[in-house]
Amino acid sequence: DTNDAITRPSWYTRRHIAPFTLGDTAIDKIIKEATHAVVSWVTKDNKPVSAVMLYRLIDGVITLTSTTNRAKYHAWKRNPNACFCICEPGNMGRQVTLRGTVDIKKDPLLLRKFSEGLLMLQSRGKPVSEARIIEEIAKFDAPDRYMMQLNIEKTLTHDLNRLFEVEATGEDVWTR
């Protein structure tokens, strides 16, 4: 009988989470709309470290900036493996985790694009004058300023809202 409900233990939904992932469109939207990521690296003695960092999407690549007095710079020079976790703005239950490696480079054009992106964020999309862009670049342009870009090797996602919805409704998302 097709009306027979499958009885599963209470913990089943939270153990079998494969249906609670995000599609490519949602992933792209989250990465484009978010402004910050929790970024991770490891210390010399392999201890994990994370920090929330502002990023800009430049030519489709997640881009950050930092100076050589920051731990992440030294960590990623030593071991470029990184993990970035990005949550949907206003909804931490929908998240994208990106694993890959970080390229570190001196690149004035990339710094300019990063600065322009930051100013567009601050102005909420209103045009920014060339003088203001130059002023912003000067704030970033320390002699030891580097640009960092994530080369994505693996993408993991989770949609906690959908999981909660399935728990509440009892919908069977495993035997479709």
Spans of model-derived segments:
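Charged, gly/pro-rich active-site loop segments
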Residues: D1-L22, R94-R176
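Short, basic/aromatic recognition patches
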Residues: T13-A37
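A generic local structural motif
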Residues: G23-A26, V49-A51, N69-A71, I134-E136
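Short secondary-structure boundary/capping segments
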Residues: D28-K29, H74, A138-F140
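Short beta-strand segments
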Residues: A34-T68, W76, A82-E88, Q95-L98
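Short acidic (Asp/Glu) patches
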Residues: T67-R70, N79-C85, S123-E136
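Short, surface-exposed beta-strand-loop junctions and turns on beta-sheet-rich folds
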Residues: R70-K72, N91, F164-E165
